[in-house]
Structures are given as structure tokens and as C-alpha cells.
Amino acid sequence: MTEPGTSVSAPVAFPQDRTCPYDPPTAYDPLREGRPLSRVSLYDGRSVWVVTGHAAARALLSDQRLSSDRTLPRFPATTERFEAVRTRRVALLGVDDPEHRTQRRMLVPSFTLKRAAALRPRIQETVDGLLDAMEAQGPPAELVSAFALPLPSMVICALLGVPYADHDFFESQSRRLLRGPGIAEVQDARAQLDDYLYALIDRKRKEPGDGLLDDLIQEQLNRGTVDRAELVSLATLLLIAGHETTANMISLGTFTLLRHPEQLAELRAEPGLMPAAVEELLRFLSIADGLLRVATEDIEVAGTTIRADEGVVFATSVINRDAAGFAEPDALDWHRSARHHVAFGFGIHQCLGQNLARAEMEIALGTLFERLPGLRLAAPADEIPFKPGDTIQGMLELPVTW
């Protein structure tokens, strides 16, 4: 079969930095104009498939002939620091069925819609406390450190049973792991987090608490369903994903709303639009841009053959701006049906914590703009730094006043 996805004349390098923090990189424009699959080149010169079409993405993310196991020899690496963790499997996200199914079943009860709803009063209390402190301090404020980051950190610590007093440590090690400049730093961050969680698990075995980590120790580790290494891998994933992604959505979501005054005014006038607004922001921002897979068999999709052992990258920011999936995709529209986006992935690896993330975002953004109706940027928008394209997207800092 022919490979029409190769129509892009010269492979675009992947990943690329965004020129605007809430839009896909302009360097991806040829991919947006092309077919659902094209070729891109990675940092090491390797050519892989990139998926940009919405329908093709949902089909492929549901296809178990694409593996998430990064220890496979031909699994794609988008950065050099990825090589630091390639040899070690990641719980849940980096395993395939049936192992993935077993791990997911352990965690599902703690992340249901009902469980997220039960946590809403605690989330609201945490949001109120953080905003009380901001108002008491007075403007200006740096919203990432004062609000966007501590909120999900506090929530995931309470859910897992991890002491929030340790947040400076695990937040800094998470940053090094996700954005460290080289292999040595990433490996050191991984080792530091491992040591911390092994010690915490050993302490909890002697003195159990009431968090999810305690439940996993009692119900899985002590019964031999998982070993300590697997539990540490699960805990690392939950701890990092539980604070890093939501913090970025809150900071970037706030910046985006402040840059779209008409949509913000509509949201303030109709607070009931907030759930739809959060869904649209998830689509519009697409902060996790670059899901990775490798084919274990030949796969035909959208007139293209992906060969066994070929790498596949999902350009989420482009997929969620596909005009075939979303009318006027570059518009921020609270009235569209956006729930079919792939910001949380799709298929068996779809984000386990999405219900909790939605609850945190709805409460955080709704309360922030209600409590601080005069909220505005405290620096020119084009001078506010945001994260590079090879990591989860978000604001590095967000100076605001009111």
C-alpha cells in the first residue's frame, strides 16, 4: 500500500515550542494542512509517524497493536532525557494489557465520578484557603506558586496519604524528572523520588494511615499482588500526574481566559457554563502534546500502513484542532460539544484521574474569577514565560493583580 502520509515535503521536527502558549506550534502548520498521518523527525534524526487527524487518533489509540511499553527497542524517544528512563517500565501508562488492566482495576474505585464529587467540598475548602491567603497578602501575586500548583498538590497528597509537608521535595524532583536538562539529572531525580517513596511505604506498613497508598499497601502489597518496585512506580505516576498536569491547566487556563475577555465575560455572566468551559479549555489547550506508541504489527489506517516496529506520535494539540472533528477549531467556544477531545488520551490508557482534574479545574477557575472580579495580568502577555514544547505545557509563572 502507498504511504500518502509522506506528502509533507520535509519532515517537521517534533516536538516544537509553541509561539503562543495556548495554540499549537506554528511549525506544525504543514501537519495541520496535510493528511491524518505524516512523518516527523525526532531529536536523534529518527523518522516516525505523527497522527494529526481526530478520527485516526481515536482509532489508533484504541488499537492494542500499538504498544505503550517504552522498553521495546523501537519505542520513540522525543527527547534525550527520555533515554534516562527508557529501560524502566512505567506503571499503568507504560504497560499493555493484561498487566495494564490489572493495575487499573486497583485504582479505579478511587477515581470514579462519584469519588470526585465526594471530594468537591474538600477541594472548595482548599481553594478558599489559598485565595484567602492571596487576598490577605494583597496584590500583585504569582499565581502558579500561590494557587495553581499548591491546589492539586494538596488534593493529591490528601488522596494518596502523602505528607503535604514534603511538597517542596516532590514538586522539585518532579520538575527535574520532567524537564531536567540531561540524562544524569533525570536519573538522579528518579532515584530521589524512589528513595522517598520506598521509605514512605515502609513507614506506612508499620503505621498505616487512611490514604490510597495505605490501601494499596494493605490490599495489594501485603497480599503479594504487587511488589515494592511496582507500588513505587504506581505512586510516582499518581503523585506527579496528580499535581503537575492540573497545575498547568489551571495556570494556562487562567492566562487563556484573561486573553479572551469576551469568553470570560460570558462565563462570569453564566457560571453554569463552567463544566462546558473546562471541557473546551481541555481541548483548546491540549497540554500533554505528544503521546507515544510503537507498532507491534502492521496497521492500516486512513489509507496508510504503519509497519511493525515503527514509532507513532500523537500530536494532541493538532488532533484537538482538527476541523473534521471540531467546527471552527481555533475558536474558544463554550457552546460546542467538546467532550470527544483526546486531551486525556483515548482507549485503555485514557487518563484515570480525569474526573478529579475536571472537579479541580471547575472549582479553581470558577472561584478565582468570582472572588477576584478585577483579576488581570500584572505584566505584558508576551513577556510572561511558558514551558517549552518538550514537556507538559503550562505557564512557568503568572504574575497577576486585581
From Swiss-Prot:
Pathway: Antibiotic biosynthesis; neopentalenolactone biosynthesis. Pfam families: p450. Heme binds at residue 351. Its EC number is 1.14.15.11. Residues 1-28 are annotated as: Disordered. GO terms for molecular function: heme binding; iron ion binding; oxidoreductase activity, acting on paired donors, with incorporation or reduction of molecular oxygen, reduced iron-sulfur protein as one donor, and incorporation of one atom of oxygen. Keywords: Antibiotic biosynthesis, Heme, Iron, Metal-binding, Monooxygenase, Oxidoreductase. Gene3D superfamilies: Cytochrome P450. Its cofactor is heme. CDD domains: CYP105-like (cd11030). One of its GO terms (biological process) is lactone biosynthetic process. It catalyses: 1-deoxypentalenate + reduced 2[4Fe-4S]-[ferredoxin] + O2 + 2 H(+) = pentalenate + oxidized 2[4Fe-4S]-[ferredoxin] + H2O. InterPro entries: Cyt_P450, Cyt_P450_B, Cyt_P450_CS, Cyt_P450_sf. S.avermitilis does not produce pentalenolactone itself in vivo but instead a group of new metabolites that are neopentalenolactone derivatives. Belongs to the cytochrome P450 family. Catalyzes the conversion of 1-deoxypentalenic acid to pentalenic acid in the biosynthesis of neopentalenolactone antibiotic. This is Pentalenic acid synthase. The lineage of its organism: Bacteria, Bacillati, Actinomycetota, Actinomycetes, Kitasatosporales.
